[in-house]
Amino acid sequence: LTPTPILVGQGENVTVDLTQMVDDPDDQAKNSFDYRVAKVPGGIDVSLDGYTLTVSGKKDQPKGPVGAITVSVDDGSGAITADIPVTIVKSSKPLVTTTDARIKVNAGQTATVNLSEYTTNPFPDPLVVLDASVHVGQGTAAGDGNVLTVTPKAGFHGDMIVVYRVMDATNDPDRVVQGRVIVKVLDRPDAPQNVTATATGPGSAFVSFQEPAANGGTISGYTIIDSVSGEPYNTINPGMEVTGLKNGVEHSFTVIAHNEAGDSDPSAPSAPVHVDAVPDQMAAPTVQG
């Protein structure tokens, strides 16, 4: 019995015909001999069907020699044994592949990314995130299992790129791959600027202002607030005529902008404007004699 070394990949199987290792001087039918497994090293699983030996490498077994399988063969004249050395080699399964994950997140808030949606995995076992770091932008990123958490820094807006590394079930450092999460970070708009008000008639004034930076989002509208009544007036334009104001007093106005990340701080108030009623037209004078 002359052992032939066995090479088996991580998470893979090989079958070995033990008759090919036997040399019988009596030239008997080697497939009729009694073959047995006496000892199996760690890191592999072994089964024997007649003279066919199946060796399975465990997925997470590091590459390298694991020891030897002790087998015996008996042609009827007495059993002999031999040790067959086994070496775990790199898995032949394809590497994990990744596609860019693209998400939107509000500044200061945390989003989770399930990487199983953006990776192909040759094994049924979940991938594991080894590490994650922010390469572009400001914020933090961390992995837990196959889930990535991303938190843009409060006050930051724009593009943020997170780079992560994942490992498959083999735990083989040669099979580590890298992926990306591209984050569009939205923040609250800046406060509107240069708010002005002009009286336009009884109980009304026209309020205009400069549109602020949207900070990665899209401004959906504005709220104009009257200093006298506290009444809000909503508009989608950077200016509107406000009506229903109290006459005979001065009004100033502040403006708040809105986008999908939230509300801006209130603007600085406009200069006060006096709103008053126009008196009714006087009746024509008459002369009494």
Whereabouts are the PLM-identified features?
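Surface-exposed or secretory-pathway low-complexity segments enriched in glycine-proline
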Residues: 15-16, 22-51, 113, 119-147, ...
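Extracellular/luminal low-complexity segments enriched in Ser/Thr/Pro
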Residues: 52-64, 147-157, 244
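Hydrophobic core positions of the immunoglobulin-like beta-sandwich fold
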Residues: 55, 150-152, 197, 240-243, ...
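Surface-exposed loops/turns
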Residues: 10, 63, 107, 154-158, ...
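Extracellular interdomain linkers/hinges and stalk-like, low-complexity segments
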Residues: 1-28, 68-123, 167-200, 208-211, ...
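Recognizes extended acidic, P/S/T-rich segments that occur
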Residues: 221-247
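Ser/Thr- and Asn-enriched, surface-exposed coil loops between beta-strands
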Residues: 12, 49-51, 107, 144-146, ...
